[in-house]
Amino acid sequence: MKPICVVLSGAGISAESGIPTYRAEDGLWAGHKIEDVCTPEALQRNRKQVLAFYNERRRNCAEAKPNAAHKVLVELERSYNVQIITQNVEDLHERAGSTNVLHLHGELTKARSSFDPDYIVPCMGDQSVNDKDPNGHPMRPHIVFFGESVPVLEPAIDLVSQADIVLVIGTSLQVYPANGLVNEAPKNAQIYLIDPNPNTGFNPVTGW
């Protein structure tokens, strides 16, 4: 049986693919207030603006290509049972060829009903304010907005709790729930932080 390697990935892993990180000066929030484009209230208040923001992000991500970091994780599958838990909403891990990817914050390539969270459909193009589910309810990006619960949190905790190795790549681990996931690893798990600007409070062997 292959050792279980759980990868916690964040925006930094996709930076070389041309996708800006959140906190960079030219990052994803540049020119936007979070409360205007990434909250349930914003969607209610100005659906057109929220959809336009995510339509632009979807187009940008579609143009990006997986980089060497994504491809290395695919190679790891030869020797490890690799389980990727990503904070990213693009599909670069999947396009690189990774088999098991869990998206904490949702996926840009999907849309879901504003009324029925289980009604999820592929979305490769732009969303419109006129998009409806079969019952006439408005569709929305399949994204976890600020203030919303993370539907896949329990499966993520379960994966980390079984890990032999945890790789933390491209994330500062400052955003919920990723900042607590690493603590779910078994006591004997090996934990490695791969980040050009590492969190000095993180011990790469024992965790926090």
Swiss-Prot record:
Taxonomy, superkingdom: Bacteria
Coarse class of the protein's main subcellular location: cytoplasm
Catalyzed reaction equations: N(6)-acetyl-L-lysyl-[protein] + NAD(+) + H2O = 2''-O-acetyl-ADP-D-ribose + nicotinamide + L-lysyl-[protein]; N(6)-succinyl-L-lysyl-[protein] + NAD(+) + H2O = 2''-O-succinyl-ADP-D-ribose + nicotinamide + L-lysyl-[protein]
Entries under InterPro entries matching the protein: DHS-like_NAD/FAD-binding_dom, NAD-dep_sirtuin_deacylases, Sirtuin, Sirtuin_cat_small_dom_sf, Sirtuin_class_III, Ssirtuin_cat_dom
Binding site for NAD(+): 10-29, 87-90, 170-172, 197-199
Enzyme Commission numbers on file: 2.3.1.286
Record: active site: H105 (proton acceptor)
GO molecular function: histone deacetylase activity, NAD-dependent; NAD+ binding; protein-malonyllysine demalonylase activity; protein-succinyllysine desuccinylase activity
Gene that encodes it: cobB
Record remark: domains: 2 residues (Tyr-54 and Arg-57) present in a large hydrophobic pocket are probably involved in substrate specificity. They are important for desuccinylation activity, but dispensable for deacetylation activity.
Name by which UniProt lists this protein: NAD-dependent protein deacylase
Lineage: Bacteria, Pseudomonadati, Pseudomonadota, Gammaproteobacteria, Pasteurellales
PANTHER family: NAD-DEPENDENT PROTEIN DEACYLASE, NAD-DEPENDENT PROTEIN DEACYLASE SIRTUIN-5, MITOCHONDRIAL-RELATED
